[in-house]
């Protein structure tokens, strides 16, 4: 009987140790990510002030994003975030936008911002290709965070 119980525990452990963080990721159907194609990082994202020039999401688009996700706009709780950030060559298209929480734990907009900054530094220093950074953050930003930042 004890062996059977130990076997059950051994088989069950992977299921309990796997972190389910899907609720912290955007819905891929609504927000697959939308990178700008053919950017030369040295002439765009690595130039100081690039994101200020590139940022152009209208209030009506922001409202549509919140409607799409059936979320009430609350500026103190959510931002309309670029899945592929502007600093990684993401577009302002609605396919690249989602409401990301500031307050959820452990994964939130502040953690994603930390990842975006790290990936931009890596792209601009030649440690990673822009396309790879775009793909990794669009595919699963939390996995990319764990890979490049840890924690």
Where do the PLM segments sit?
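Sec-dependent N-terminal signal peptides
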Residues: 2-13
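Nuclease and nuclease-like effector domains acting on nucleic acids or nucleotide cofactors
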Residues: 14-77, 88-151
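Short active-site segment of divalent metal-dependent hydrolases/proteases
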Residues: 85
């Amino acid at each position: 009987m004890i062996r059977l119980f130990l076997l059950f525990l051994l088989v069950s452990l992977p299921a309990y140790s796997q972190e389910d963080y899907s609720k912290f990721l955007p819905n891929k159907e609504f927000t697959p990510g939308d990178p700008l194609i053919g950017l030369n990082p040295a002439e765009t994202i690595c130039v100081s002030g690039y994101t200020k020039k590139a940022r152009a999401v209208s209030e009506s688009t922001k409202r549509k994003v919140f409607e799409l996700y059936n979320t009430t706009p609350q500026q103190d709780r959510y931002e309309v975030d670029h899945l592929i950030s502007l600093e990684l060559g993401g577009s302002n298209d609605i396919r690249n936008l989602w409401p990301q929480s500031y307050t959820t734990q452990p994964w939130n907009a502040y953690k994603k911002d930390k990842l975006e900054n790290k990936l931009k530094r890596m792209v601009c220093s030649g440690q990673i290709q822009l396309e790879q950074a775009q793909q990794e953050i669009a595919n699963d930003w939390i996995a990319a965070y764990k890979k490049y930042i840890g924690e």
